[in-house]
Amino acid sequence: MMKTEPRGPGGPLRSASPHRSAYEAGIQALKPPDAPGPDEAPKAAHHKKYGSNVHRIKSMFLQMGTTTGPPGEAGGASGMAEAPRASDRGVRLSLPRASSLNENVDHSALLKLGTSVSERVSRFDSKPAPSAQPAPPPHPPSRLQETRKLFERSVPAASGGDKEAVARRLLRQERASLQDRKLDVVVRFNGSTEALDKLDADAVSPTVSQLSAVFEKADSRTGLHRAPGPPRAAGAPQVNSKLVTKRSRVFQPPPPPPAPSGDAATEKDRGPGGQQPPQHRVAPARPPPKPREVRKIKPVEVEESGESEAESAPGEVIQAEVTVHAALENGSTTATTASPAPEEPKAEAVPEEEASSSVATLERGVDNGRAPDMAPEEVDESKKEDFSEADLVDVSAYSGLGEDSGGSALEEDDEEDEEDGEPPYEPESGCVEIPGLSEEEDPAPSRKIHFSTAPIQVFSTYSNEDYDRRNEDVDPMAASAEYELEKRVERLELFPVELEKDSEGLGISIIGMGAGADMGLEKLGIFVKTVTEGGAAHRDGRIQVNDLLVEVDGTSLVGVTQSFAASVLRNTKGRVRFMIGRERPGEQSEVAQLIQQTLEQERWQREMMEQRYAQYGEDDEETGEYATDEDEELSPTFPGGEMAIEVFELAENEDALSPVEMEPEKLVHKFKELQIKHAVTEAEIQQLKRKLQSLEQEKGRWRVEKAQLEQSVEENKERMEKLEGYWGEAQSLCQAVDEHLRETQAQYQALERKYSKAKRLIKDYQQKEIEFLKKETAQRRVLEESELARKEEMDKLLDKISELEGNLQTLRNSNST
């Protein structure tokens, strides 16, 4: 279970992750830093303390048992402007293991990290110091130094015998100057055990970036800032700064002067009293190299040993700087200075007295540990061999007494940089331009697309030897969960909602969505799965399905487990304040699709279950078989349908408290978690008791129903026997009716034949009648025509008769006359 803290007005929304720390380190490196002056007061704290895991890690590594030199053997450095006693004391660095509760730690990788860092610091610490400083007496080597020796022996020789001799001389100097010290890098790994490798020759390696990111994150959590000025007075408040910033400048050094040969050059370069100035390093004249990069990593936490803490002043600060000017890979070196040069008075924001004192602090240890038979020429030769492939690195270390508290002034530095108007950071160019595309001979005039012929920039990346990208021990899904959550919350529309919790709860059920859900990581967040109809959320109407729960009563639910979110919702009372995140209109996220698919799958499973129960019920009705008591006890029951329960199963494999973890903050946090678990468990027990009581009542009711059903079965058997007798009588009656039906069908067929015959006769008669009428009409017409002809003939004859009678009369008259 991940620890959640209430989100303040300016606090982060989630805890640190290695990916985001590296990202912030890269962003910080691109900003122009501005070191505050020595008289500036520390910035105000953000009122945020370390988590309990930091104290647990620190206590665990304090018990590893390392030997440090007695406080009396650390001699004071005369002529030093700052930290005269603290610079000689033994310093302790403790490499903590991972801060999460359920992660394994590769201690060998952490020891290798501390060894590589101490080797880099001591490797460049090879300047001669004033001869007046006596060499410290030898001390028994610590465990970290023994581990480093074994690691150095295992590394194969990269060059011939001269290179090995120079390396052995440098190792002797390193052991003599750092026997009573242990370099300690306090790193807070969030489950990431990425391999950190050596510095690259042309650019800062991922090791420097990740260390810077770690310390910047630690400082941003504590909220204090220490100015790299002079140490405070004895009565000043005790502050232990852990701020690490990278300050980079790209500059062109002036051409080196011609170096004289022999002892004359050595004597000329030495200051009064035969001491070589700590800020200058002379090398043979070479052509001016390309612009090189200056990187600062400061301040690294350095804690004093237990014996030195008792006698040191409260406000003493250990301050050290290592300045290494590396030339190109071809072995050329130039004379450079750690103090501000006349040509670049503001190249580094470090006071002159601070640079001189800090450089002299480390030079004294190297001079004390150098073999007496080594000549200055050999030292210069070893410097040439050693610095030919290194970067220009400035390392400052600050330490103060007191509790683990520090601060971050990243935002203040950014504002100061903008006010001062310094030029932005320009990283060293790591790209090569190659010829681009050739111009086309005959491009089509109608074509609207044209290809650029500008040179193509090819950027070089780290090789696998310089940057080990393998990360088998960390789940990438879990490591980027919080980063994904923050990016998702930024894209959502956030709005507050206040609900009044009633006796039935809030009326919502939640679901944790994410690929890492099996490990307790809800990568996509806590979402509203269902809204109970008639509940508080349903009556309010503002909370909908698929909404993201960002906060509940000030408790952030980003990057927490589903069980923790359920316990937070269960323990709310009265008026509950929500911070809801919702997709903007027109957007359909993958989370909404996942929740919709989940609800559809559950609905499908519920329908399949109901169909299965219905099928079982039909089979029971047909066969008359019923489930036994054992089947009833084992079968699932859903008396009230699907219930939206906000209580979820808690993880049982929590880490047990060990003596190392017995700190008040850890115990208080664990006690609160146990209280929440206890309340959740009691609620689950009460709910299970109510379920058990309802199931027992349901079981008794089912038994009564079973007896009633058995009695009804007996009655139904008697009724079935009576129905069988009725069925036999009905069969005989059906046979008689069937015979009568057959007779009726025969009669019907005979009548049908007679009817068809009569129908044919009627048709014949009607046809004959029609023909008779036609004949009668024709004969009547012929008769009428004959009558008309006779009538006309009769009229003609009558006319002739009358005419003849006239003629006859005429003749008679004539005859008479």
Swiss-Prot record:
Q: What is the effect of changing S122A?
A: No effect on phosphorylation
Entries under Gene3D superfamilies matching the protein: 2.30.42.10
Q: Does the keyword Transmembrane helix apply?
A: no
Its subcellular locations are: Cytoplasm, Cytoskeleton; Nucleus; Postsynaptic density; Cell junction, Adherens junction
Q: Where is this region: Interaction with ADRA2A, ADRA2B and ADRA2C?
A: 169-255
Per the record, which residues fall in region Actin-binding?
A: 1-154, 164-282
Indicate the impact reported for S59A.
No effect on phosphorylation
Locations of Basic and acidic residues compositional bias?
290-301
Chain positions covered by the region annotation Disordered: 1-93, 117-166, 216-445
Impact upon substituting S126A: No effect on phosphorylation
Where do the segments described as Interaction with D(2) dopamine receptor lie? Answer: 100-371
Q: Spell out the Acidic residues composition-biased ranges.
A: 410-425
Biological process (GO) annotations held by this record are: actin filament depolymerization; actin filament organization; calcium-mediated signaling; cell migration; cellular response to epidermal growth factor stimulus; cellular response to estradiol stimulus; cellular response to morphine; cellular response to peptide
**Coiled coil residues, start to end:** 595-616, 665-816
Summarizing the annotation, the consequence of altering S100A is: Diminishes phosphorylation
Effect of substituting S94A: Diminishes phosphorylation
Q: Where is this region: Interaction with TGN38?
A: 595-816
Q: Which UniProt keywords apply?
A: Actin-binding, Cell junction, Cell membrane, Cell projection, Coiled coil, Cytoplasm, Cytoskeleton, Developmental protein, Differentiation, Membrane, Neurogenesis, Nucleus, Phosphoprotein, Synapse
Q: Where is the PDZ domain?
A: 496-584
The PTM entry states: Stimulation of D1 (but not D2) dopamine receptors induces Ser-94 and Ser-177 phosphorylation. Dephosphorylation of these residues is mediated by PP1 and possibly PP2A. Spinophilin unphosphorylated or phosphorylated at Ser-94 is concentrated in the postsynaptic density, whereas spinophilin phosphorylated at Ser-177 is absent from the postsynaptic density and enriched in the cytosol. Phosphorylation of spinophilin disrupts its association with F-actin, but does not affect its binding to PP1.
One Pfam assignment: PDZ_5
Q: Per UniProt, what is one GO molecular function of this protein?
A: protein kinase activity
Family matches, as InterPro entries = Neurabin-1/2_PDZ, Neurabin-like, PDZ, PDZ_sf
Xref: PANTHER family:
NEURABIN, NEURABIN-2
Q: Subunit comment for this entry? A: Interacts with DCLK2. Possibly exists as a homodimer, homotrimer or a homotetramer. Interacts with F-actin, PPP1CA, neurabin-1, TGN38 and D(2) dopamine receptor. Interacts with RGS1, RGS2, RGS4, RGS19 and ADRA1B, ADRA2A, ADRA2B, ADRA2C, CDKN2A, PPP1R2, RASGFR1 and TIAM1. Interacts (via C-terminus) with SPATA13 (via C-terminal tail). Interacts with ADRA2B.
Protein name, entry field: Neurabin-2
Query: Which organism is this entry from?
Result: Rattus norvegicus
- Taxonomic classification: Eukaryota, Metazoa, Chordata, Craniata, Vertebrata
